[in-house]
Each structure stands twice: as structure tokens, then as C-alpha cells.
Regions:
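Extracellular/virion structural assembly segments
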Residues: 1-16, 64-135
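Polar/acidic, low-complexity leader/linker segments enriched in S/T/G and N/D
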Residues: 1-52
Length: 169
């Protein structure tokens, strides 16, 4: 019968902690967005590692189905939340990125995807900042710049900016 010592012996490194991570957003090559990459990394308050799904194909055989793996559907959206500081650095950069893809005023923008897409990184860290695992979200760009909720009832909180992002795997 397993006991607590067996469990502790099998929980390598004490387990990966949800609050030990780093997000790095590299600006796209074709749009000047004015993002301080190092500062933006410090302002991240939450992120996710999206799920991975395989499709399933039902193959009928004499009144029953057997199931085999199918194609991988498009990946889920990757979402990251930032503290919004008083110079709105991250928000301004994301607005410039969006406007570079499709300008509000004249409905133009960069055409080549490599000019507005970039690689984004999430690193799971150990408690001493050793990188345990790195996830790379390739050809990413912001789908939405989420609303920033404002309220006079919130006396002791910061505003946050959430950024849902499309990517390739």
C-alpha cells in the first residue's frame, strides 16, 4: 500500500507550480509596436497552456463503430493577462499591432503574414528560475484586445489587459 513517503518520492522536484512561469512576446518584424519585451514579461499576471485535441473518426462495422484518431483541429486560443501600468505600454503596443494588421482609418495594413505574426514563448520555471519546459506558439498575432474593466467600486485593485492570441502549433 502506498504511503505519503512514496508519494513525495514520486513528485519530482516538489511539482511544477502554477505561479512559476515567464511569458515572452517578441514584436512582429513588419510592425513597429514599441513593446519593451523585458518589462512586458514582468507585467504578465496570468497565462495558459492551451489544450491539445485529436479528432476522432467513427468507422461503422456491422452495426457498431470503432474509433480511430483523426486530424488535429485548429488549436485553442492562447490567452495571457497583463497588469496595466500607467503608461499603458502593453495596451498601446497591442493597439499598434492590431492597427498595423488592419488600420481603423483606411482599412489597410501589412499583407505578408510574416510581417505581423511572431513567435511567443511560455516557460514553466522551477523555484530557482530554472526553465523546466518551453512552449513556443508560432505565427501568433492578437485576435482581440480585451476590454479593461473600470469601476469606482474597485478601490484596491489594478486594471488588467487580457490578450487572446491565435497561433500555429
Amino acid at each position: 500500500m502506498a504511503n505519503i513517503d512514496d508519494f513525495k518520492a514520486n513528485l519530482i522536484g516538489g511539482g511544477a507550480r502554477a505561479n512559476q512561469f515567464r511569458v515572452t512576446i517578441t514584436p512582429p518584424s513588419g510592425i513597429a509596436i514599441g513593446l519593451d519585451v523585458r518589462r512586458a514579461s514582468f507585467l504578465v499576471t496570468a497565462s495558459i497552456l492551451p489544450a491539445s485535441t485529436l479528432g476522432e473518426i467513427a468507422v461503422p462495422f456491422r452495426g457498431r463503430n470503432i474509433y480511430v484518431s483523426g486530424d488535429r483541429p485548429a488549436p485553442d486560443v492562447w490567452s495571457t493577462t497583463f497588469y496595466n501600468d500607467t503608461d499603458f505600454m502593453v495596451r498601446n503596443a497591442m493597439e499598434l499591432w492590431h492597427n498595423g494588421i488592419n488600420d481603423f482609418a483606411n482599412n489597410t495594413g501589412v499583407i505578408n503574414p510574416s510581417d505581423y505574426q511572431t513567435d511567443l514563448f511560455v516557460e514553466q520555471l522551477d523555484r530557482d528560475d530554472t526553465i523546466l519546459k518551453t512552449y513556443i506558439f508560432r505565427a501568433a498575432y492578437p485576435l482581440t484586445i480585451a476590454a479593461i474593466d473600470l469601476s469606482t467600486a474597485e478601490a484596491v485593485s489594478y486594471t488588467h489587459l487580457t490578450l487572446p492570441t491565435s497561433f500555429l502549433v
